[in-house]
């Protein structure tokens, strides 16, 4: 069972997704490219949870680099029974993947909550509040209500787009890390079987 190509592909993909998550999260701090809303604390509370920077970003880069570090390893030893050290290698990849699952899961949850609550925005009376907090996310299906937010301009579109990106990327990261966990378990079982086969051959 050769899994080096799969692990390498997962590692490279996670690096790309992690960078995109970090960028998306950073953009949430600057609606319309302006910094004043962050200084004045007029951003969604979930922006400050660092879901994309920490969860979908840094906690994904860790397993990604672990997987890329394994690409030079011989992961095809199951057929030739060259399995010494394989179990330790696979265990490290599983542990790294579990960290990735935790990080991506956090990213998905926070992004979903951010979408459900909606942005913090200024209404027609100049009051800042969560206009869509009590809609249970139904505002997402009715764009005609988005005009209730007067400031920042297009803040609903900004939040919906970026939180949706974080939600999608976090979901993809979760799936890839889960695949690597399954891959590592199967590789470990394969290595275990080979070690017993070696004993019988001796």
UniProtKB/Swiss-Prot annotation:
InterPro entries: L6_membrane. Glycans are attached at residues 129, 159. Keywords: Glycoprotein, Membrane, Transmembrane, Transmembrane helix. GO terms for cellular component: membrane. The chain crosses the membrane at residues 10-30, 50-70, 94-114, 162-182. This is Transmembrane 4 L6 family member 1. It comes from Mesocricetus auratus (Golden hamster). It comes from the Eukaryota.
């Amino acid at each position: 069972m050769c899994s080096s190509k799969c692990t390498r592909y997962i590692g490279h993909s996670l690096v790309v997704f992690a960078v995109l998550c970090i960028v998306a999260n950073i953009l949430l701090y600057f609606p319309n490219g302006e910094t004043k809303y962050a200084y004045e604390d007029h951003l969604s509370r979930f922006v400050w949870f660092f879901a994309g920077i920490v969860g979908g970003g840094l906690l994904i880069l860790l397993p990604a680099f672990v997987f890329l570090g394994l690409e030079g390893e011989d992961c095809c030893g199951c057929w030739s029974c060259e399995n010494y050290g394989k179990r330790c290698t696979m265990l490290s990849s599983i542990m790294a993947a579990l960290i990735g699952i935790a990080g991506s899961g956090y990213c998905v949850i926070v992004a979903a909550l951010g979408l459900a609550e909606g942005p913090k925005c200024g209404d027609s009376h100049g009051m800042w509040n969560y206009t869509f907090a009590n809609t249970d996310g139904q505002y997402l299906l009715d764009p005609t209500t988005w005009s209730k937010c007067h400031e920042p301009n297009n803040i609903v579109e900004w939040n919906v787009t970026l939180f949706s990106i974080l939600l999608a990327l976090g979901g993809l990261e979760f799936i890839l890390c889960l695949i690597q966990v399954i891959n590592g378990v199967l590789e470990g079982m394969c290595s275990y079987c080979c070690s017993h086969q070696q004993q019988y051959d001796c």
